Amino acid sequence: QTLALSTTSNQCSLKCAHCNGHYLNNMVPIEEYEEKVQSRNITSFLLSGGCSYEGDVPINTHINTIKNLKEQGYRLNAHLGLMDKDSIVELCKYLDIVSFDLVFDDETIREVYKMKKSKEDYIEVYNTIQEHTEVAPHICIGLKGGQIKGEYEIIEYLQKNPPNKLTFIVLIPTKGTEYENVEPPELEGVADILCEARINLPDTEINLGCMRPRGVYRKELDQLSIMCGVNRIVLPSRSAKNKAIEMNMTINECKECCVL
């Protein structure tokens, strides 16, 4: 019941190594949201889009539409990227939560995003958002071409001020991108990171997000996630549900974005 909207249609200036604008094609242009709402039982929106060369998602260009959505009672989650402080302050008046990718390895930032940004830039924006609305940090495991670089450092940083929610996603080698021929991170390494987060952030709700490889990898990852103490899995495989039942867990099904 959460509809993903792109504020830039299928356009992205960064053309990142792991995405190349591919996933924007799965989103609805924000100008067309009304017809989709009429045909589906939509209760919330994910506001997203492609990035500028500076790494921000320019959803503020549609602030009147965003304000209108909020006034209609929809819950709003957003991707802001490395947005400037003034725009963050203005937008957060209408946002229930922000999903924010944290990247701490400078080499990864240069290789994946082609930006001259640093860990400090991400921390600064993260803290600014935190001052004005709830933020759910996102960690992409294996972002640097399937390599684990910087993920543990992010978990260590989050221990200082644990978030209510933390979402993990996993690199998908995607056709038409620079990383189409790489291997996703090894499952053992992914599981170790999930366990590290669970142990060190005991009161944080940990989610396994929608962006993760499909097939056998996904089935095995989903089962491992249950065993690592993950709280929510987006579109879980049957094997994950069976594992949860086997472990006598209570299963609650939600219909919206995992951070809402």
Residue positions per predicted region:
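Conserved Radical SAM active-site core
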Residues: 3, 8-9, 21-135, 148-152, ...
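Short cysteine clusters
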Residues: 12-19
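Conserved, mostly hydrophobic/aromatic
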Residues: 16, 47, 100, 197, ...
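Active-site-proximal loop/turn and secondary-structure-junction residues that shape catalytic pockets
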Residues: 51-53, 80-84, 104-106, 141-145, ...
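Short, surface-exposed connector motifs at secondary-structure boundaries
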Residues: 69-74, 134-137, 201-206, 226-228
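Short, surface-exposed loop/turn motifs that are enriched in glycine and acidic residues
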Residues: 112-115, 140-148, 179-187
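Auxiliary Fe-S-binding modules of radical SAM enzymes
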Residues: 152, 159-260
